[in-house]
């Protein structure tokens, strides 16, 4: 069973995405801020992380940078899932090592699951 960590501060969205991934056979953990999300990555060792950018305690960009700096975590693919869609934000996310940059408004939860499966099948 593939493991996914969803780091999202909006409880409605995190529950919605979690339910969709569970329905598709994933083991899911959820975190609501960047700091606890980083700790959860280390403990849970997910196959992929879905990461919001606007988060309390540590934003998604800072967290992504910390994940990619850690030897034991840097191979875990991180997908940014956010409403921030400016070109400079997308470029920053990719430059920091994000596998993919998904703008929430452009993707249904089903499409997000399909994209995650596509990424995991490439690895």
Language model features: what each stretch is:
Residues 25-32, 40:
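Short hydrophobic/Thr-rich beta-strand motif most characteristic of the beta2 strand and flanking loop
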């Amino acid at each position: 069973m593939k493991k996914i960590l969803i780091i999202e501060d909006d409880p409605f969205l995190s529950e919605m995405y979690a339910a969709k991934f569970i329905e598709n056979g994933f083991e899911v953990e959820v975190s609501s801020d960047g700091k606890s999300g980083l700790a959860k990555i280390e403990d849970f060792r997910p196959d992929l992380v879905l990461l919001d950018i606007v988060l309390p305690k540590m934003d998604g960009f800072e967290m992504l940078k910390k994940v990619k700096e850690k030897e034991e975590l840097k191979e875990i693919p991180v997908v940014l899932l956010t409403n921030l869609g400016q070109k400079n934000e997308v470029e920053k996310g990719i430059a920091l090592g994000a596998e993919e940059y998904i703008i929430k408004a452009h993707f249904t939860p089903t499409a997000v699951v399909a994209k995650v499966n596509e990424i995991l099948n490439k690895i």
